[in-house]
Amino acid sequence: MGKGKFGTIVQIGDILVSEDVVTEYFACDYAVCRGACCIEGDSGAPLDETELEGLERNYPAYSAWMTERGRAAVEAKGFFEVDRENDIVTPLVSPEKSEISGGPDLATAQRCECAFCHFGEQGECLCAIEKAGCTKPASCSLYPIRITHLTGGGLALNVHHWDICKPAFEKGARERILVYQFLKNPLTKAFGEDFYEALSAAAKHLHG
């Protein structure tokens, strides 16, 4: 571990983990947000180039769970688009074609619906890819952790803070669930058991 500009940095191999991953509390409160992270913001979910082939290959399996407007977006744009920061992200439904679903929080959102959304009977937003039993993008599974590819090689993991996830940070604090604990399974899947064990050890050290 070392002290970086923004606090303690945990280094595990070629992965730099910010302190907030192991010190902040988080537990998704779906009953409150109802999947708002999939329909808010101005960009789709980050994608790794290695995920594109799977998105295309599995499309026949999960497309039936998508909305008609979502399928239209994929037909028009393909399985990804490039955002204003030149990052590869999931395609978005055109704003004029997006419908407002759910309660007042969703209705007042800056609407940028992911093409891979599926909506339940009560207007709640789910992932069509996951609904079909396929693997959704890693950035979705790892949220609120965001991955940055470093110029010199390696990765950096940071916690992304977003107003719509305030209930999740509050729920995590109530239930004493840390970010890395909430994301144990996706972190292990993405980086391996040895990585997660090292991260847990670092967390215990920081918490004294």
Question: Residue ranges of each PLM-predicted region?
Answer:
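Short loop/turn segments that flank or connect secondary-structure elements
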Residues: 1-208
